[in-house]
Amino acid sequence: MTTPGYSGRPQAAKLGLKPGHRVHLQNRPDGWALADPPAGLAGPGPDGTADVILAFFSRAEEIGGQIGELARRIYPAGALWVAWPRRAAGHRSDITDTVIREYALPIGLVDVKVAAIDHDWSGLRLVWRTEHR
């Protein structure tokens, strides 16, 4: 049986995680972990760069203070997932996908996917615009 609001795809597939990817979890909530991550995931490189960053935020103002540095760490071809509390799960937050775009678009990022990361978190996948790579 599948959970309402979910595609049935494994979390790692939704997030685009592959063996060998360098992954960083920013502002990870206590007790939160990737569900069934692929073998061979690694932490960020010595300079903090990563193929995929999953950053959790509860308030919009937190995004503005961190998105520039997070974007630098995925340059040129990585992905930044900005996660916020899912309203469909009864959580409250001032973050929406529109709010995230207001921070992301002016610095050269573009959104390419939205997904339910899990029961409690929604996510918007951001990448560098092709002309900025």
Model-based region annotation:
Residues 1-38:
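N-terminal, charge-rich interaction modules
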Residues 16, 38-40, 68-70, 95-98:
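Short, glycine/charged-enriched secondary-structure capping and boundary segments
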Residues 40-50:
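Short acidic low-complexity segments
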Residues 54-63:
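Short, glycine-rich nucleotide/cofactor-binding loops
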Residues 64-95:
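Mid-chain, well-packed structural core segment of small domains
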Residues 94-113:
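Conserved Class I S-adenosyl-L-methionine
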Residues 108-133:
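Class I S-adenosyl-L-methionine
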